[in-house]
Amino acid sequence: MKITSASLFALSATALSLWAPSGYARQNDNTQLVTANRFQQPVSSVLAPGEVITREDIDRWQAKSLTDVMRRLPGVDIAQNGGPGQTSYIYIRGAEARHTLVLIDGIPLAKSGITGIADFSQIPLALIQRIELIRGPRSAVYGADAIGGVINIITENSEPGGQITAGLGSNRYQQYDAALRQKVGEDTLVTAAGAFQSTRGYNIQPQSAYAVDGDRDGFRSKTFWAGVNHRFSDSLSAFFRGYGYGNNSAYDAGYQDGSDKRQVYNHTYEGGMKFSEERYSSELTYSYQRYKDYNYASTLGLYGPGTSLDDMSQRNLQWGNSVAMANGTLSAGIDWQQQKLVSRDRFNADSYRRNNTGYYLTTQQQFDTITLEGALRGDDNNQFGWNGTWQAAAGWAFMPDYRLIVSYGTAFQAPTLGQMYGQSRLFVASNPALRAEKSHQIETGIEGLSGPVEWHLYVYQNKINNLIDYRADENFVGTYYNVQSATIKGVEWSGSADTGIFTHRITLQYIDPRRDQDNEVLAHRSRQQYKYQLDWTALDVDFDFAWQYFGKSYNNNTNQYAATQRRMPGYTLVDFAAAYPVTSHLTVRGKIANLLDKDYETVYGYRTPGREYYLSASYSF
């Protein structure tokens, strides 16, 4: 029997038709979220669109990378230069990839390189215990970068126990990880974890005219995590954690002795104190990150003449406070950040430093059926001065189980150090006059519980001014500059329901992202997205089925070197996974990714994986 997308979706639709009124548990879910306003609150109370992904979700989906996880979420589009370990870009609600603020345990992720884009392909999935996603502007809460949204990756698990996992898959995929969380006495929890992941990969550019590009492009990652939490009293505790990873990936150079290997090294150390008593809580955290990114030619070696290095060190100090009030919560704090970037090759080196101090105030208040939310923030940056942002939202529960939401928010994106001061090794000239990108978004939404279906509908418009773009002269010396603006309009609907043994999740999205100067659609954005996920348990086996459709997009925007846009066709992906608990401690899992073996590209000329098979086993104790 031939398996088709239509037949699989028909099976899902049949299951969906079996709805029974059991969806209220999801509406009354007490899942807590911190990222929206920097204080803990139930997901159902947040006025911004948000998602919480747990480690249990990641294991059920049997995701192999962070991009696998993010692709399932509402409002998220992904472009990647091939398979595992290859450069990836995540677009939230049509905003640029650099317009997403990425936090690790609430601390901004250090990003090397000139673009200011977080490369999700380099963040090991084994580190992640939980992900919180907020869609829409959040600069009034966190400062720069949060134009399209915020992704907070949480690495800590406070539950004692341990787990060992081993897995194999297509293209000689291997996965091994172990974690142990042990209580020492009544007040101390010690955690240690490590992971290894590798794949032989495949040739990501089979159409390349260069013989050196005919090899496989593999990936290897090693990860560690260690931490200790100690409680001095019921109100005072302290923590320290350190983690890091080393990644090796291969890619295609395009010419003899060109860079075709990448090595990334990251290590992070964090420590802090937490105080909580009655209505008041406070947390003080210090973090140090070091991120080194090498690119080199395999024919010349890591220390050969063609090697380049981006070496970023980042220090963060955060002091946050929250007070529970009669009708809600008030939060205020200070963020300090120092970045130092050294970018070099054999002949040239560029060094930059930046300091930023931010002051924020956020609140949410409840008055009968009205919920009000607001935030103010000011950032003092030694390179581009003072920048203020604000946002406000109101929710009205106009009838039981239904709420109307209106929000407005401003945001900004600071130029990177490399964009402002150039990188001579990359023939990028300086432009210290670059202005910060600024945006303002207005959004309306309605959400409700209709029978078994919990649903959310949002309509939004995001206007981004001073967009930063790149151009080069006739000698190929380039510079970054501010262009006019872009406007992104969108509508998204998401819903979920429990029907007997089945749990359904559906996302429908349409966006219209355009440059204002010529009405051209922005590159790498699928204007239509349809996503369906079905989870169920039968005969003690947990099943997961995911169907995703991404509409057509464009690979580029026009410039002096590209007179037209290259159209990228839409594509459909289907994944299927199953897990069986052999004992109360041992679970075996299997997955077929890209079940229909679709041949598609998200970046022109870069092949994506075909059908792949995975098998793993986990032992918990």
Regions found by a protein language model. Name each.
Residues 67, 71-107, 129:
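Extracytoplasmic beta-strand/coil segments of soluble accessory domains associated
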Residues 70, 131-133, 151-153, 406, ...:
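Non-catalytic regulatory/gating segments with a bias toward low-complexity or hydrophobic composition
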Residues 108-135:
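Short acidic/polar hinge/loop motifs at secondary-structure boundaries
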Residues 139-140, 152, 159-163, 167, ...:
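Periplasmic-side early beta-strands and strand-to-turn transitions of outer-membrane beta-barrels
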Residues 233, 326-331, 335-465, 505, ...:
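Structural signature of Gram-negative outer-membrane beta-barrels, strongest in the C-terminal barrel
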Residues 256-272, 276, 310-315, 383, ...:
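Outer-membrane beta-barrel signature, preferentially recognizing the C-terminal barrel domain
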Residues 326-327, 365-372, 459-463, 481-558, ...:
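Gram-negative outer-membrane beta-barrel transporters
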